[in-house]
Amino acid sequence: MSFIKSRKKIVTTAIASSLSVIATSAIAQDEIAKLPTIKAQATAKQSLKVDQSANTKFVAPLLDTPKSVSVISKQLIEDTKVTTLSDALRTVPGITLGAGEGGNPNGDRPFIRGYSSESSVYVDGIRNSTSQNREMFAVEQVEVSKGSSSSLGGGGSVGGSINLISKVAKKGDSLEGSVQGGTDDYQRITLDGNKDFGNGIAGRVVVMGHHNNKAGQGDDATEYKRAGIAPSITFGLDTATRATLSYYYLKTDDTPDAGVPYNNPNNYAAGSGKPIDVKQGIYYGWKDRDFQKQENQIGTIKLEHDLTDSITLSNTAVYSKSKNNYVWTQPDDSQGNFINPTTGQLKDTGIWRRANTRITDTDSFSDQLALTGKFNTGSLKHSFNAGAEYSKAESDKGSYTITDPNTKNITGAVANGACSLGLVASNGWCTSTFNPNSKDPFLGTITPNRAVTTTTSETTSVYVLDNIEITPQWLLDLGVRWDKFDTELKTNATGVKVENNTDFFSYQAGLTFKPTENSSIYASFATSANPVGIDAGDGSETAVNANNKDLDPEKARTFEIGTKWDLFNDKLNATAAIFRTEKQNTRIQLDPTTYTNGGDSKVDGIELGLNGNITDKWAVSAGYTYLDSENTNPGPSCGRTGPCNPINAAKGKQLPNVPKNSATLWTTYKVLPQVTLGAGAVAMDKVYGNATNTKWVPGYVRYDAMAKYDVNKNVNVQLNVNNLSDVRYFSKAYASHFATEAEGRSAVVSLNFKY
């Protein structure tokens, strides 16, 4: 890869930034009081309430931060036993998960407040937007920032961003882990050991092994297998100069889920648009052909030096490598194989197992240099973070070539005889609508066709964030960031290149009034910019191409008014906010080959939250979000060929992947000194998959339960039952073709230990 050729420049950048930290140490005082490390919890006791973000770009406590931030705490992760980021995000209202056809069809594709945040996922404040299914085994907590926020993290972040906080070496000795088993061949083991070697040195290793089938589908269907390890070592604990080296590795080998077609395919538009009425847990995939193999690695070097007792200089250098290779079944509806176009009745003449394939190999490097701390200018007290960032990513994309003894099987076309009654029993490319056979033999060949295109993206940024205490009752929050973003797509066979080069400013401003020390009322404004190719071509965002190479970044802005209160001796946090996000300059299509900036959309909303302890025995994490979305100017309606229609049916419609109402609840109560009971619910309104609102999945309410028995102070046994009532619902709605059915009821027993 040409990425290797630029490694010398990258290494030089990292060394130069890191040496600036070390050189400063040499001229500083011999003894400097260490700036207290901010912890997610104020005390050693874990809680559902988190007071301070682990991201240093949040320069004030969350209570005094003028924007909505939801934190999935370590306690909530342990209570619910979530194992993936997608599972964890279901505990946050206002977030939905999107499906894809290519790029990232089965990976993390969250929508926050109505807009995609796939390219706005961070690990320890460093962008991590490659297409993948993220694991929770090495995650301490997850922070979800709501609203436009490019001033915090750069391009993207229209509806918000997600930051995963990693488990790294710390002071003290500890050993904890969990051995789990459950329904659907669920098997999982995690081990987390931290050793304090003295002299300011500590090491930590977290390991995980996992296997399960998708709940409700039985054997020979969707299957998940993965293993991971995350070692880290820290030097200089409790000193003015600290260094942390960490590594993360995750390997997965899954059989992906295929989903269920909608009931209004191309040949029967009169269908209502919901998924077809077939049995719960149906699986249209092809075990002998389908797979998804991922490998993700992250290496990090973080250096910190306290210039004074209130100013810290830090540098974080990260190199990551990601692979995502798959062949998965899209249960295609484009050929009209399974429905009678006259009556709309389902036919058992077969679902075409269209093969979607991808080979992606992405390398990236990021370096962040930051100066953080506190200082005064007269009577004004500043808490700030100022820094510079550089990143470069290179993504090779290819696909698999699939051959078959009978080419009509691959096309799925009825005109060629595919999916006829005579082929259902013998042709794996088409399977029964009502009783699909996942074990059909695959007689073809799968050949990799690697590195068809290479996308290179480079970002240079500088920013300043400042929280100013004007008086103890009035706080002013300001932020500005400048990004230069360059992206290039090269077709390797021809050498043809297209590129998009842009730069943009992002801003945030907020004013906070504190009626009391433990409360705040705020008003804020923030912007974001979404340039072409923000995910470096590795994901569902459209990469730069000949049609969009000259377009400007999409723009968004969020207005928010809210309040936050710490109640019951600061053990419980209550929040409320009203907001509007407006997206402007959206890329729209004028004809089959011409795009421009000209679209608009908006989301108005209300958000309520409650996190922490009502009593010492009763804990709760709850939230509600109302989203009123509208596609105010979608542009003309254009197909792949032919002229565009100036009248677009999407105008005035609800945005895709945006439920009007969504709510989450998790609560636990210690009924006896050794017994804790928990219950949860997730509720969501109807969600549309496409812009014209003709494809949709119904709303639902899902219930969960937990019971935990403390054998002693170090060991407990925990039972989690998810989807208690075994309700059938769909977790993802794609814009065409299919929706993804969620898991049925499952139960997991865990033996947990902590020393």
Question: Predicted regions span which residues?
Answer:
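C-terminal beta-signal and adjacent terminal beta-strands/loops
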Residues: 683-690, 708-755
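Acidic/polar loop-and-plug regions of large Gram-negative outer-membrane beta-barrel proteins
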Residues: 210-215, 221, 227-306, 321-362, ...
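Acidic, small-polar-rich N-terminal luminal/periplasmic segments of exported/outer-membrane proteins
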Residues: 20, 35-172, 561
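Membrane-embedded beta-barrel scaffold of Gram-negative outer-membrane proteins
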Residues: 303-306, 310-318, 322-328, 521-522, ...
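Structural signature of Gram-negative outer-membrane beta-barrels, strongest in the C-terminal barrel
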Residues: 236-238, 362, 381-393, 453-583, ...
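Gram-negative outer-membrane beta-barrel transporters
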Residues: 580-582, 597-692, 725, 750, ...
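Face-selective signature of the C-terminal outer-membrane beta-barrel domain
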Residues: 302-320, 354-490
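Outer-membrane beta-barrel translocator/receptor signature
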Residues: 137-140, 151-229, 237-241, 297, ...
